[in-house]
């Protein structure tokens, strides 16, 4: 908690601090701290979050966001988003990545299913890992619908339909690039990514997290309210 003494912490620096309960914190509550002074500064920042988890910071090669659903018939885990870019960088939401079949990612499938069965949870979920070398380092399980779950649908695995209708078949999924363009374009705006590189990635994207050509009205309504109904 904020009142604990940082001198008693035995985790080696650098470390990462994040809300222990994601529903009671924000992305802004996640910090990478290299010294006790930076940790104290992070804990002193104004926030609604009071309790945090501290972990050794792993210099990851990339993050994996495994997307699945737990049903009466067992766990269905078709694939994972290999995140190439986040916003804010390193610690933020997935902005651009590749949804790949789970068989390609060396995930402990049986261990994960056992964990979910023991938890008693049924419904959509996601599991996040850090990847470095030949290892996947467990981060967290989210017992909720994942923001990137639409990538699984576009790749051929409609998990929500399968959850409500066991007769829905999920065949082998295909690798699919996904992008949250409104976040990812900030890399270009900030000068961290050339426009030509971003356009290349955008053109090979088949899953825009916040836009669908088959259903454009939600996006149009979003920008209409943003532009013309400001208070």
What is each residue range found by the language model?
Residues 129, 140-143:
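Active-site proximal loops enriched in glycine and acidic residues that flank catalytic Cys/His/Asp
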Residues 1-53, 58-59, 70-74, 105-109:
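Active-site nucleotide/adenylate-binding loops and adjacent lid/helix of ATP-dependent enzymes
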Residues 49-50, 118-122:
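Short secondary-structure junctions
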Residues 165-231:
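Peripheral (often C-terminal) accessory segments that flank ATP-dependent C-N-forming ligase machineries
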Residues 15, 76, 137-140:
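Protein kinase-like catalytic core scaffold
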Residues 9-12, 132-137:
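A short, glycine/Asx- and small/polar-enriched loop/turn
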